C-alpha cells in the first residue's frame, strides 16, 4: 500500500525530469546562420582595368599605351593592412604578368593599325656610304659608318608614274642583294609586313595602375626582403597597384621600383641556366644615352594619303650614339649584387661576361629613347671577376670616370620577337638625349657543374614578362567571398513577411582589414564592412562613361575600354549572384540571417568557443569548403518550405484586423451580398407562398387572395370573445397577413431568424450532449485504463516480490544444505585422528 501511495509522486517527478532533459538537449542544438560581408577570399584570375594620370603628360601626341582611355587615378588611394594574416605569393605563376604582357602587345598592335604600310618600299635600293664633312669614310659599306644614302623608285600620286627619291637608312635596316655592294633591300621585306609608326605616336612610358574590379581585391606583400615566392607575413589589400612604367628593355631594367633594405635576387632556380634571374637594386645607377647627330626629317609620298618619313640629311659630323654610366656607381652596385649572389651560391667566385649571342635585342641592351630604338653593347659593364671577401678585379684597365657603351640605332624593329610583324620607327629630328635610372638587372647563369668554384653570369632578357614580373612580384588578385556560413544557437522562429531592403555589397578594402581577427570580432563590424560594392560598381561605370565621353570622337574602343566593360559586367554578375543566393535563402538585405537548417556535426564538430574565439573566417572557410554546396542546397530547401508555409498563413491575413472590414473598397462587395440576401428572401417568400397555396388547395380550401386568414394558435385559457361564445373552444384562430413590402420582408426575416435560431440551438445542444457524453465516456475509459494500469502494476510488483522471495528461500535452503554438508565433511576430517587412536586402542586391547 505504501508503494501505491508513492506512485503518483514518482510519475510526477519522472515527467518533470524528462521535460528538463528535453529542454536541455534542445538548447544545445546548433543552426546554420548566414553572414554577409565576411573577410574571406580565394585566389582568382579576373580582368583587370587600368588607371592613369594621363593629364599630367603631354596631350598633343597620342601615347602608344592609350592611357587616355584609363580611369583617373585615385587621389587618396586606400591601403588596408591586415593584421595576423599570412598569405602565399608566387611571382612566377602570377596571372597579372600574363595579362599585362598581352595588354601591352595588344596596345602596341592597335596603335599601329591606322598607320601606313611600307610594302611599296620593298624595292631595290641603290646605296652608298654617308661621308663626314671633315673626314674620309671607307669605300665599302661593311667598313663604313652607321648610315647609308639610298636612292629608289616609288609610285607617285599617279599610279602609272614613278619618281626617284633618296633617303638615309641605318646599316642594320638594310641587307645586300646577292652580295652586291651597291644594291640592297629592307631587312624585313622577305619575312614581315612593315608598318610605319604614326608620326604623332609617342613611346614615352606613362605609369599604368592595374586595378581590380568590384568584388575582387589585390593583395600586396610588404615584406622588404620578399623574394617573390613563399609566405608573406606583412600583407595589405589595395584596389590598384602602384604606377608601373611599361618600359620595353633587355638586360637592364629602367625606371622601375627599388628595393628598400638590400638588393633582392629573385629567381625560380638560380642554378638553372634556362631561368632568368631578376635583380632588384637598392640604389639606382644613372645612365645617359645620346644620339648626337642633328637629323632632319623628309617626307616621301607613296601614293594618295600615304607618306614615308625618312632621314633627309645630317647637319654636322656623323657621330655614333652612345650611353654613359658612372664607373664608380656601377662597380659599387655590382659589388652589392655579387654579395647577394654569394649568399645563394655559398660564397664562390663570381664572374660577369657579355651575352653569348642570339637576337640583337637579347645580345645588346635594347630600349627606346625619345622614339628611337637603341641597341647598346654592354661588354663594358659585364666583364669582371669577383672573389668573395676580396677586392674587385677587372679585365678592364681603363681608368675613365665613365663607362661608355657604343650604341646602334634601328628603325625597322621586330617587336616582341614575333615573326611576320615589323615596325618602322620614323626618324626623330635634332639631337636626342634621355636620362634613365637602372633599377634592376636580368641575368642568366652559365650551364656548369654544381660543384664548380666559379659561376659565370651574363646579361639576358628578351621575354618582356620578366620586366612586368619585376614590378608585379608583390601582388596577387583574389576573389572576395562575402557569404559566410557558421553554426549558432539562434534559430529562425517566426514566419512573417519581410520588407526587403536594397542589399549592400561588401567593401573589400574595409572589411579585409578584419581578416586576421577571430570570427566573433569580425562579425561585430559587418555593418561597416558591407556597404561599398554596389557604389564601387556605379563609380566604375561613371569613370568609364566619363572616359568614353572625353574620347567620343574615337569610335574604336581601346584595349582598356574593353577591359573596363568586362570588369564592370563581371562585378555586376558577382553582385547579382550573391544577392540571388541571399534571396533564395530568405536573407535579402540582412547582414546576419538565421535559418531553420540544423547544423550537422559531420560538417564540423568544433564547439562554439573554438569556432568564434579562436578561428578566423579564412580558417573556418577552408574547414567547411567541402560542404558548402550541400549547406546551400539545404538552405534553399528550407526557404522553399518556409515560403510555402507563409503562403498558407497569408491566406488568413485578411482577418488580421477588423477595421479592414470598413474599407470603402469592400462596400461594393457588401452591396452585392445584400442584394443576394434580399433576392434569396424574396425567392423563399414566393416558394413558401406557393407551397402554402398548394397545401391548402389539397385540403379543400380555395384561396381568394393573399389576405386569406391563416390559423393562429392561442391559449386554452382564452375564451371566444364574441358572437357564439358557447361550445368547445377552438385551439386556433386566423390572423391576416401583413400588408406592404417592408412588413413582408421584416416578417419573413423574423420567421427565418427564429427558424435558424431554433435549428442552430438544437444542433448546438446535440453537439454539447455528444461532447459531454464522449467526455464522460473518455474520462471513464481513461480512469478504467489507469486503474487497469495500477492493477497490473501492482500485480507485476507482487509477482516480482513473490519471485524474489521464492528465489531467496530457494537460495537460503540450498545454502543451508551446502553448509550442513560442508560442516559434516569438516567434522569427519577433524575426527580422523581420534578414530585412528580409537582403532589403535581397540587393537591393543
Curated annotation (Swiss-Prot):
Residues 708-731 are annotated as: Disordered. Highly glycosylated by host. The high number of glycan on the protein is reffered to as 'glycan shield' because it contributes to hide protein sequence from adaptive immune system. Residues 622-656 form a coiled coil. Glycans are attached at residues 84, 126, 132-133, 136, 149, 153, 179-180, 190, 223, 227, 234, 255, 269, 286, 294, 324, 331, 347, 377, 383, 391, 395, 402, 437, 449, 454, 600, 605, 614, 626. The chain crosses the membrane at residues 674-694. Residues 501-521 are annotated as: Fusion peptide. Disulfide bonds join 50-70, 115-198, 122-189, 127-150, 211-240, 221-232, 289-323, 369-434, 376-407, 587-593. Keywords: AIDS, Apoptosis, Clathrin-mediated endocytosis of virus by host, Cleavage on pair of basic residues, Coiled coil, Disulfide bond, Fusion of virus membrane with host endosomal membrane, Fusion of virus membrane with host membrane, Glycoprotein, Host cell membrane, Host endosome, Host membrane, Host-virus interaction, Lipoprotein, Membrane, Palmitate, Signal, Transmembrane, Transmembrane helix, Viral attachment to host cell, Viral envelope protein, Viral immunoevasion, Viral penetration into host cytoplasm, Virion, Virus endocytosis by host, Virus entry into host cell. GO terms for cellular component: host cell endosome membrane; host cell plasma membrane; membrane; viral envelope; virion membrane. Inhibitors targeting HIV-1 viral envelope proteins are used as antiretroviral drugs. Attachment of virions to the cell surface via non-specific interactions and CD4 binding can be blocked by inhibitors that include cyanovirin-N, cyclotriazadisulfonamide analogs, PRO 2000, TNX 355 and PRO 542. In addition, BMS 806 can block CD4-induced conformational changes. Env interactions with the coreceptor molecules can be targeted by CCR5 antagonists including SCH-D, maraviroc (UK 427857) and aplaviroc (GW 873140), and the CXCR4 antagonist AMD 070. HIV-1 lineages are divided in three main groups, M (for Major), O (for Outlier), and N (for New, or Non-M, Non-O). The vast majority of strains found worldwide belong to the group M. Group O seems to be endemic to and largely confined to Cameroon and neighboring countries in West Central Africa, where these viruses represent a small minority of HIV-1 strains. The group N is represented by a limited number of isolates from Cameroonian persons. The group M is further subdivided in 9 clades or subtypes (A to D, F to H, J and K). This is Envelope glycoprotein gp160. The lineage of its organism: Viruses, Riboviria, Pararnavirae, Artverviricota, Revtraviricetes. The gene is env.
Amino acid at each position: 500500500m505504501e508503494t501505491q501511495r508513492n506512485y503518483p509522486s514518482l510519475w510526477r517527478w519522472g515527467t518533470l525530469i524528462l521535460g528538463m532533459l528535453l529542454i536541455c538537449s534542445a538548447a544545445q542544438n546548433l543552426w546554420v546562420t548566414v553572414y554577409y560581408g565576411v573577410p574571406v577570399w580565394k585566389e582568382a584570375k579576373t580582368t583587370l582595368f587600368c588607371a592613369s594620370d594621363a593629364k599630367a603628360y603631354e596631350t598633343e601626341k597620342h601615347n602608344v599605351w592609350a592611357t587616355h582611355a584609363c580611369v583617373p587615378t585615385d587621389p587618396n588611394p586606400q591601403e588596408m593592412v591586415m593584421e595576423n594574416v599570412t598569405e602565399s605569393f608566387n611571382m612566377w605563376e602570377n596571372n597579372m604578368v600574363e595579362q599585362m604582357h598581352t595588354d601591352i602587345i595588344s596596345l602596341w598592335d592597335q596603335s599601329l593599325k591606322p598607320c601606313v604600310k611600307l610594302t611599296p618600299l620593298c624595292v631595290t635600293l641603290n646605296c652608298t656610304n654617308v661621308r663626314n664633312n671633315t673626314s674620309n669614310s671607307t669605300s665599302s659599306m661593311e667598313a663604313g659608318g652607321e648610315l647609308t644614302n639610298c636612292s629608289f623608285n616609288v609610285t607617285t600620286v599617279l599610279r602609272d608614274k614613278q619618281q626617284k627619291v633618296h633617303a638615309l637608312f641605318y646599316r642594320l635596316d638594310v641587307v645586300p642583294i646577292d652580295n652586291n655592294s651597291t644594291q640592297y633591300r629592307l631587312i624585313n621585306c622577305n619575312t614581315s609586313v612593315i608598318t610605319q609608326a604614326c608620326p604623332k605616336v609617342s613611346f614615352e612610358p606613362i605609369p599604368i595602375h592595374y586595378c581590380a574590379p568590384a568584388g575582387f581585391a589585390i593583395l600586396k606583400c610588404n615584406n622588404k626582403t620578399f623574394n617573390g615566392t613563399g609566405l608573406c607575413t606583412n600583407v595589405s589589400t589595395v584596389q590598384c597597384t602602384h604606377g608601373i612604367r611599361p618600359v620595353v628593355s633587355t638586360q637592364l631594367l629602367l625606371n622601375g621600383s627599388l628595393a628598400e633594405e638590400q638588393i633582392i635576387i629573385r629567381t625560380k632556380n638560380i642554378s638553372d641556366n634556362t631561368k632568368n634571374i631578376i635583380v632588384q637594386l637598392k640604389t639606382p645607377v644613372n645612365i645617359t644615352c645620346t644620339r648626337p647627330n642633328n637629323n632632319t626629317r623628309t617626307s616621301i609620298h607613296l601614293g594618295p594619303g600615304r607618306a614615308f618619313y625618312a632621314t633627309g640629311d645630317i647637319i654636322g659630323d656623323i657621330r655614333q650614339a652612345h650611353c654613359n654610366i658612372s664607373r664608380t656607381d656601377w662597380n659599387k652596385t655590382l659589388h652589392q649584387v655579387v654579395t647577394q649572389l654569394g649568399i645563394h651560391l655559398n660564397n664562390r667566385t663570381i664572374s660577369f661576361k657579355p651575352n653569348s649571342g642570339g637576337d640583337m635585342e637579347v645580345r645588346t641592351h635594347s630600349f627606346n629613347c625619345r622614339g628611337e630604338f637603341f641597341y647598346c653593347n654592354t661588354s663594358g659593364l659585364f666583364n669582371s671577376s669577383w672573389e668573395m671577401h676580396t677586392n674587385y678585379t677587372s679585365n678592364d684597365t681603363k681608368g675613365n670616370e665613365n663607362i661608355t657603351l657604343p650604341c646602334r640605332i634601328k628603325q625597322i624593329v621586330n617587336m616582341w620577337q614575333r615573326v611576320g610583324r615589323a615596325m618602322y620607327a620614323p626618324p626623330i629630328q635634332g639631337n636626342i638625349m634621355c636620362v634613365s635610372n637602372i633599377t634592376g638587372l636580368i641575368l642568366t647563369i652559365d650551364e656548369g657543374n654544381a660543384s664548380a668554384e666559379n659561376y659565370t653570369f651574363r646579361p639576358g632578357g628578351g621575354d618582356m614578362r620578366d620586366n612586368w614580373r619585376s614590378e608585379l612580384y608583390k601582388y596577387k588578385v583574389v576573389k572576395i567571398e562575402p557569404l559566410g556560413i557558421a553554426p549558432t544557437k539562434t534559430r529562425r522562429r517566426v514566419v512573417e513577411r519581410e520588407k526587403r531592403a536594397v542589399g549592400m555589397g561588401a567593401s573589400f578594402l574595409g572589411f579585409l582589414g578584419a581578416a586576421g581577427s577571430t570570427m566573433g570580432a569580425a562579425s561585430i563590424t559587418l555593418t561597416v564592412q558591407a556597404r561599398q560594392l554596389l557604389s564601387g560598381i556605379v563609380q566604375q561605370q561613371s569613370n568609364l562613361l566619363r572616359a568614353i565621353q572625353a574620347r567620343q570622337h574615337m569610335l574604336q574602343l581601346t584595349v582598356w575600354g574593353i577591359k573596363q566593360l568586362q570588369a564592370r559586367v563581371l562585378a555586376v554578375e558577382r553582385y547579382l549572384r550573391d544577392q540571388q543566393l541571399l534571396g533564395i535563402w530568405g536573407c535579402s538585405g540582412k547582414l546576419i540571417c538565421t535559418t531553420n537548417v540544423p547544423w550537422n556535426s559531420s560538417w564540423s564538430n568544433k564547439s562554439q568557443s573554438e569556432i568564434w574565439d579562436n578561428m578566423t573566417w579564412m580558417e573556418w572557410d577552408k574547414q567547411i569548403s567541402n560542404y558548402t554546396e550541400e549547406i546551400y542546397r539545404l538552405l534553399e530547401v528550407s526557404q522553399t518550405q518556409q515560403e510555402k508555409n507563409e503562403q498558407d498563413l497569408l491566406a488568413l491575413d485578411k482577418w488580421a484586423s477588423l477595421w479592414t472590414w470598413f474599407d470603402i473598397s469592400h462596400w461594393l462587395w457588401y452591396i452585392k451580398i445584400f442584394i443576394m440576401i434580399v433576392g434569396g428572401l424574396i425567392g423563399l417568400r414566393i416558394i413558401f407562398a406557393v407551397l402554402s397555396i398548394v397545401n391548402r388547395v389539397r385540403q379543400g380550401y380555395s384561396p381568394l387572395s393573399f389576405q386569406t386568414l391563416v390559423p393562429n394558435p392561442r391559449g386554452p385559457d382564452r375564451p371566444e370573445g364574441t358572437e357564439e361564445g358557447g361550445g368547445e373552444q377552438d385551439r386556433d384562430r386566423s390572423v391576416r397577413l401583413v400588408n406592404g413590402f417592408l412588413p413582408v420582408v421584416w416578417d419573413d426575416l423574423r420567421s427565418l431568424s427564429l427558424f435558424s435560431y431554433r435549428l442552430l440551438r438544437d444542433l448546438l445542444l446535440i453537439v454539447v450532449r455528444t461532447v459531454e457524453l464522449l467526455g464522460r465516456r473518455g474520462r471513464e475509459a481513461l480512469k478504467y485504463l489507469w486503474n487497469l494500469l495500477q492493477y497490473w502494476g501492482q500485480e507485476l510488483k507482487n509477482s516480482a516480490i513473490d519471485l524474489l522471495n521464492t528465489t531467496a528461500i530457494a537460495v537460503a535452503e540450498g545454502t543451508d544444505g551446502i553448509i550442513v554438508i560442508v560442516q559434516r565433511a569438516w567434522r569427519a576430517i577433524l575426527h580422523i585422528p581420534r578414530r585412528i587412536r580409537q582403532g589403535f586402542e581397540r587393537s591393543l586391547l
